[in-house]
């Protein structure tokens, strides 16, 4: 009996490696360039490995635009450092984006918590509702 195997494409492996290496590089660059603190949350690489969408989250959400702008300005330097760290013939061009999934998740969590605070007595009773 053969076990089903999950296929991992090269882009998935490269993406994971870029995320690990770039996470370390970005952490140092943020400190060196006085940028707001960010961390790399995800990396999506194009099939041809020419471009990488780098998603970052900011500790201070209100300074996220400043952080992404700063990373875009030093993207060439970061790509050079990434090339030194990785054994790839061509290192993808880096495109930085703010990852708002954490903010959206937090907003949903707050909404759910607010619903819990309201309690079931505020919800319309199923028997009182008119059929549609």
Curated annotation (Swiss-Prot):
Chief site of localization: cytoplasm
Q: Which UniProt keywords apply?
A: Cytoplasm, Ribosome biogenesis
**Where is the protein localized?**
Cytoplasm
Any one GO cellular component localisation term in the record: cytosol
Query: Single Gene Ontology BP term?
Result: maturation of SSU-rRNA
Q: Which Pfam families does this entry report, sorted A to Z?
A: RBFA
Which InterPro entries does the entry link to? Answer: KH_dom-like_a/b (IPR015946), RbfA (IPR000238), RbfA_dom_sf (IPR023799), Ribosome-bd_factorA_CS (IPR020053)
The record's subunit annotation is:
Monomer. Binds 30S ribosomal subunits, but not 50S ribosomal subunits or 70S ribosomes.
General function of this protein? One of several proteins that assist in the late maturation steps of the functional core of the 30S ribosomal subunit. Associates with free 30S ribosomal subunits (but not with 30S subunits that are part of 70S ribosomes or polysomes). Required for efficient processing of 16S rRNA. May interact with the 5'-terminal helix region of 16S rRNA.
Report the family membership.
Answer: Belongs to the RbfA family.
Which protein is depicted? Ribosome-binding factor A
Q: Which organism is it from?
A: Xanthomonas campestris pv. campestris (strain ATCC 33913 / DSM 3586 / NCPPB 528 / LMG 568 / P 25)
Q: What is the lineage of its organism?
A: Bacteria, Pseudomonadati, Pseudomonadota, Gammaproteobacteria, Lysobacterales
């Amino acid at each position: 009996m053969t076990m089903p195997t999950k296929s991992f494409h090269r882009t998935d492996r490269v993406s994971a490696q870029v995320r690990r290496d770039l996470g370390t590089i970005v952490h140092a660059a943020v400190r060196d360039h006085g940028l707001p603190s960010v961390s790399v949350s995800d990396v999506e690489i194009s099939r041809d490995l020419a471009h990488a969408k780098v998603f970052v989250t900011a500790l201070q959400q209100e300074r996220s635009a400043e952080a992404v702008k700063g990373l875009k300005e030093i993207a060439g330097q970061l790509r050079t450092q990434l090339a030194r760290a990785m054994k790839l013939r061509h290192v993808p061009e880096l495109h930085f984006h703010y990852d708002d999934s954490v903010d959206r998740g937090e907003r949903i969590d707050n909404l759910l918590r607010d619903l819990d605070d309201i309690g079931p007595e505020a919800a319309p009773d199923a028997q009182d509702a008119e059929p549609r």
